[in-house]
Amino acid sequence: MRPTPILIVLVFTWLGCRCTASHAQSAAEWQARQVEAAQKSEAIMLDANKRASLLAQFQVMRYAYIGNKDPAFQIIFGQYLSWYQSFIGDYQDAATSFSIRQEALPDDRPSPLDNPEFGAEPALTAIPRLARNHRAVFFNEAHNIPLTRTLTVQLLGKLRAEGFNYFAAETVYQTDTGLQSRGYPTKDSGFYTKEPICAEMVRTALRLGYKVIGYEALSNATGNAREAEQARNIYQQVFKHDPNAKLVVDAGYAHIQESGVYLGGSSMAEHLEKLIHIDPLTVEQTMLYEHPSSSDDHPYYGPAMRKLHPEEPLVFVSKAGKPWSLRPGYDVSVWFPPQVIRRSRPTWLGLGGERKPYYVDGGRCNRHFPCLVEARYANEGSDAIPADRVVLDPVPLNAVPSDRVKASDLHPFSDLYLRPGKYRLTYSDADGTTLFSQNIAIKDQGDASLEAQPGHAGDSSTAIAEPCASAGSRPASQQAAQASCNR
């Protein structure tokens, strides 16, 4: 994945006019500042990636952001920072660092709430039904909002049951030739696969028996040429040798739109349709979700949430079976419910109940903060992207270095979200040094939110996650957290 060329174009499109007005300068001057900011951002990211540990890379990124207050830099670099915040499991800050306002547009279709012909359905049941008459299903995502990957992860099994057998992900590197046989992604598998939900999407596809491919352009092409090359790569790897294939695609934003001008030409989806002459089901997931500021939500979003109070992603389908989409170019739009935060983490990490919360606190960090906690599947190598990770720190992750001396709470706590099974749990510092490790098992039933029993650095003992205990039965350092156990 090559994020920079598309990044600049998108920021100009989404944010440029608003910022130009506020800074009273010409559009050309503002664009020049953004280009300069993009070059700085790329250089900072390259420097950060020289660090061995992900946490050290994040430290470089966050302090670079704090240290440069130029509005053009903060807008551009905010997206870079948000990627790394998502990589370390800091999903709330990732959403805040780069938020795209979803304004009403002239070609928006009327709200389905105003049409009695349309009814809301759980996306998990409606989309597989809608996909039955299609040979390809395209999902899009907002790269810094892993919420927009969660439904795709949950749908892979249902689509596999409908005969879909190829999974193409924009982010997967074609150079990772061992991905299929290995069965899990590593840091060399892709750019966004460094984020645990994205990695879980690829891992799930592999586990279900999909043939997983990457299709990003290998040349330096941009715009329409890049879209066309992506489409050719999918055709060469899938339909050229398997004309009866059924394909699931994960791509960013408008790469999946089926009509209209995209980056001065056509989208990847449009180019692919011309090559294979099949009509995909296109599922839009980046416009109708809760933003950090409600002023960034699409005007349809709030009224729908207040009326329906959903607890899972929804789509609208007419009585005649036709799905509703917000804009032309897509077949169906997904509405994500407002997120619920538990111990500083969104509960959508539970993937609709497939994963359980597992309590962790800073006692095992031995006063080394920030401290990265990761859980890897026991049957995967140490190079695997973890099933989940979270950073424990007594100061906010967007704080400046001087704030660290003010911190008094040395036992920050949070939750990891894990499927039933066995894991290797590790705590490490910014240098990548392991501070504590333990084997844990998540039971198939119950709320797995009880902390494992204390161990030592390098300890390989096993702990079993149990349902929430009463506050009195737990160590004093954990009793404050217990109050939120069943929220």
Which role does the model predict for each range below?
Residues 1-7:
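Bacterial N-terminal signal peptides that target proteins for export
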Residues 7-8, 479:
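Intrinsic disorder/low-complexity detector
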Residues 8-18:
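Bacterial N-terminal signal peptides
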